[in-house]
Each structure stands twice: as C-alpha cells, then as structure tokens.
C-alpha cells in the first residue's frame, strides 16, 4: 500500500497555514497556531484519530482567531482529501459517541466526496480562555467542505464548554479514523465506483 499522506500550504493576506498529514500514523503531532486552546484541540484530534499531524499557522490574531481557525480547517480538510487518494479499500463510514466528563457527543462521517456539515451543538459559554467558541462550527465546516465528506456532529449532553468542545474533537477524530481505515477489501465502496 502506498503512503496515504497529504501536504497543503495556503498563504493569504490574512494567514499562512502549513499542514502535513499521514493517515496511517500513530497520533504523533506538532501543532502551533498561536492559540493554545485550539492547539490542544488539534493535538487531541491527532492523538485520537492516530493521524500524524504537523500543522503551523500564522494569522491575524490581533483581529481575532476566525481566519486562522477557518484556514486551518480548510488546509486540514484538503490534506485529508489528498491523503485518501482514490479511496480504494477504505471503510468510507465512521461514527463515534464520545464522553468527556459531563459532555457526550455523537459524530458520524461519510467520505462521500460531498462536503457537508450538520452541526447541532450549542455552546454554554462564548469563550474558553481566549478562544471564541463559535469558531468550533466554522472549523468543522471548513474541514468537511474542503475534505469533501459528510460530517454530522450532535451534542447529546454537556454543561462545561471546554468538555463539550473536547468531546466534539475526539468524536470526530474517532469517526474519521474508522472511515479512513482500510476495510480489507478492494475497490471503491460505492455503487458508482467513485467517491
């Protein structure tokens, strides 16, 4: 099997983001975005997906974190798409229900070639430290649209915003790990013979 890796660089007037991803990794990460809480969530994503991830971002944080978080999602989504290649032999679908203390999140993925986010998770607090919690949805929308996969996220329980966000990142990581995993079969998992 050839390496399933993706390398993406994006430079705009607002941000510069570099991503290197290995789908068949061990969860090794090196992340620096200038936003410590977001770094922690991306590290959590890498650890629980077992995707090796190097992600660096420099953005206009003096304005706010929106551009940095969204562009990180754009680049990570594109890296996932590149690493999946023609999707021959993948599971295609993945889902997980993940607790984090009081929080419980369901995530489901279809690596269908169609980018869509359905996000049903209200945040009790507008901020966790310096991190704007409405950016969680923006990150996952950019990830799903640019990765060209369906992603459903539903919060089932939770009152602590940090725990809610962490359970979301872990649930998505576990879902993508399953969906991107190799089924042991051959061929494209679609009656269309393409994804």
UniProtKB/Swiss-Prot annotation:
Its EC number is 4.2.1.19. One of its GO terms (molecular function) is imidazoleglycerol-phosphate dehydratase activity. Keywords: Amino-acid biosynthesis, Cytoplasm, Histidine biosynthesis, Lyase. It comes from the Bacteria. One of its GO terms (cellular component) is cytoplasm. Its main location: cytoplasm. Pathway: Amino-acid biosynthesis; L-histidine biosynthesis; L-histidine from 5-phospho-alpha-D-ribose 1-diphosphate: step 6/9. This is Imidazoleglycerol-phosphate dehydratase. The gene is hisB.
